[in-house]
Amino acid sequence: MQAACWYVLLLLQPTVYLVTCANLTNGGKSELLKSGSSKSTLKHIWTESSKDLSISRLLSQTFRGKENDTDLDLRYDTPEPYSEQDLWDWLRNSTDLQEPRPRAKRRPIVKTGKFKKMFGWGDFHSNIKTVKLNLLITGKIVDHGNGTFSVYFRHNSTGQGNVSVSLVPPTKIVEFDLAQQTVIDAKDSKSFNCRIEYEKVDKATKNTLCNYDPSKTCYQEQTQSHVSWLCSKPFKVICIYISFYSTDYKLVQKVCPDYNYHSDTPYFPSG
């Protein structure tokens, strides 16, 4: 009966079997399992009672009651004692290994529109020299690629005279009438959407030698100005309109840049 009981315990509950054998071998050591906290029980079993609880001794005592008496000598090194902090660290590390690694964040792909060509400062310039005035106007056009573009002008003059630089539709008539220089027809207002974004004018005066008579001193006025226009769709073609008036010289000029140069669709003038 005793042997049958041992076999049942061995097959059903191996843990209970080991504890029972430990009690049969040395009854005094069973107090280690009853006293003390649950956290330090494992540490006491594998340190103080390592000789009495060796696996080779437990197995040999178990198989001696059988007909074929066999002693098994299994080497088992006593493990090093672990502190409570070591056990917590081990549990924390094992938990971290099981957690899935976060996916690397990919940078969003920004689809940028195809930027069109632009006119630089050297692509447009107007240089006017008279006896009493020296004028230089440069400009550039920048297409922002989002349906808008900017037009910049720089004006530098020395002498006396009136200069006007503006943007007009291609249907603007070239004429000397000052009253009609800034007038835009109603039919062109839908295709011409431009406004002044920035404007600055600096003036200074100085006395220099006269151009017509170097032996005399003339009063000259220097003017520097910067202006920028912002245009947006819908638009077709813009033209640069320059009007210059002086005591000895008059000039009205309209310059329309090649629209095919900075646009995907060709422009066909009408009217």
Curated annotation (Swiss-Prot):
What does the UniProt record tell us about how this protein is modified after translation? May be proteolytically processed at the boundary between the N-terminal non-conserved and the central conserved domain in neuron-like cells.
Gene Ontology terms describing biological process: modulation of chemical synaptic transmission
Signal peptide positions are 1-21
Q: Region labeled V (Cys-rich) — which residues?
A: 186-271
Region II, as annotated, extends over: 22-97
Q: Which residues are glycosylated?
A: N23, N68, N93, N146, N156, N162
Recorded GO molecular functions are: signaling receptor binding
Q: Indicate whether Phosphoprotein appears among the record's keywords.
A: no
What are the record's GO terms for cellular component?
GABA-ergic synapse; glutamatergic synapse; synaptic cleft
Q: Where is this region: III?
A: 98-176
Query: Where expressed (tissue)?
Result: Brain, only in a scattered subpopulation of neurons that probably represent inhibitory interneurons.
Q: Which family does it belong to?
A: Belongs to the neurexophilin family.
| Role this protein plays | May be signaling molecules that resemble neuropeptides. Ligand for alpha-neurexins.
Instruction: From the Swiss-Prot or TrEMBL record, give the protein name.
Output: Neurexophilin-1
Q: Which organism is it from?
A: Mus musculus (Mouse)
